[in-house]
């Protein structure tokens, strides 16, 4: 599990577009757990692709990305309190 966090400057021109693009890229690979925070479970190849996609979107002079590798036993390292219940990505999907 990788925790992806980002801060995109929306004051400068193009900032809102970059913010939407970063959020969309993260949603394509994981689930939003807070504003600007995503949990992502990917294999190494998909992780390289996501990182490249995100880093191509942001303006490094104005925006930032942070990645936290929580490892394979991430469930034991994450405590959740409050609203927005966690979604079990490995549980059954009911449509």
Swiss-Prot record:
Domain of life from the UniProt record: Bacteria
Organism: Rhodospirillum rubrum (strain ATCC 11170 / ATH 1.1.1 / DSM 467 / LMG 4362 / NCIMB 8255 / S1)
Gene: cas2-3
Swiss-Prot/TrEMBL cofactor(s): Mg(2+)
InterPro entries assigned to the protein according to its UniProt record, in alphabetical order: CRISPR_associated_Cas2, Virulence_VapD/CRISPR_Cas2
Name of the protein this chain belongs to: CRISPR-associated endoribonuclease Cas2 3
GO molecular function: metal ion binding; RNA endonuclease activity
Hydrolase is among the record's keywords: yes
Gene3D superfamilies the UniProt entry points to: 3.30.70.240
């Amino acid at each position: 599990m990788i925790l992806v966090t980002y801060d995109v400057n929306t004051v400068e021109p193009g900032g809102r577009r970059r913010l939407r693009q970063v959020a969309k890229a993260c949603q394509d690979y994981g689930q939003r757990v807070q504003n600007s925070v995503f949990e992502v479970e990917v294999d190494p190849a998909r992780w390289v692709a996501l990182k490249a996609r995100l880093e191509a979107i942001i303006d490094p002079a104005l925006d930032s990305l942070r990645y936290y590798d929580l490892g394979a036993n991430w469930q034991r390292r994450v405590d959740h309190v409050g609203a927005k219940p966690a979604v079990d990505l490995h549980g059954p999907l009911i449509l």
